[in-house]
Amino acid sequence: MFIGTYNHSIDSKNRMLVPSKVKATLGEAIFVYLSLGFDGNIDMRLESEFNQFVNNINNLLIGSKEARNLTRLILSQTYKIEIDSASRILIPQNLIDKAKIKKDIYIIGTNDRYEIWAKEVYDDFSLNQESTLSDLAEKLLINGI
């Protein structure tokens, strides 16, 4: 399970140092999968979690046009990235641009993945979500989640 929030930054070459606590949760992995997230962030998954994610999409919407389109959009913007000997990953420029990352980032554990957010984008998102936290919890509890 991936948890926690880490303040970090990327360098001028779009490299992110993987925080030691994050690295510890990745185990012996030498690769991670980076893809565009649903909320303007970058998702970082281990191979097993990424494969499960794609399988879940396909199983939910077997053969549907929506499943094909979603799978196409996700896989066309997914990169298998090596964790180098200095525990850094290189984030592709198109993901940097789409996530509006300048320098400062948050790395956020969200159970089966880490999300990489531009600091400014997440600060705005977080501010808007905190006011609805109790509403979201209530709706999910009513639905048995």
From Swiss-Prot:
CDD domains (UniProt xref): MraZ_C (cd16321), MraZ_N (cd16320)
Cellular compartments annotated: Cytoplasm, Nucleoid
SUPFAM superfamilies referenced in this protein's UniProt entry, alphabetically: AbrB/MazE/MraZ-like (SSF89447)
GO molecular function terms noted in the UniProt entry: DNA-binding transcription factor activity; transcription cis-regulatory region binding
Biological process according to GO: negative regulation of DNA-templated transcription initiation
Domain (SpoVT-AbrB) ranges: 5-49, 78-121
Keywords: Cytoplasm, DNA-binding, Repeat, Transcription, Transcription regulation
Gene3D superfamilies linked to this entry: Transcriptional regulator MraZ domain
GO cellular component terms given for this protein: cytoplasm; nucleoid
Coiled-coil positions: none
Chief subcellular location: cytoplasm
Any Pfam family: MraZ
Subunit structure, interactors included: Forms oligomers.
Similarity remark: Belongs to the MraZ family.
Protein name (Swiss-Prot/TrEMBL): Transcriptional regulator MraZ
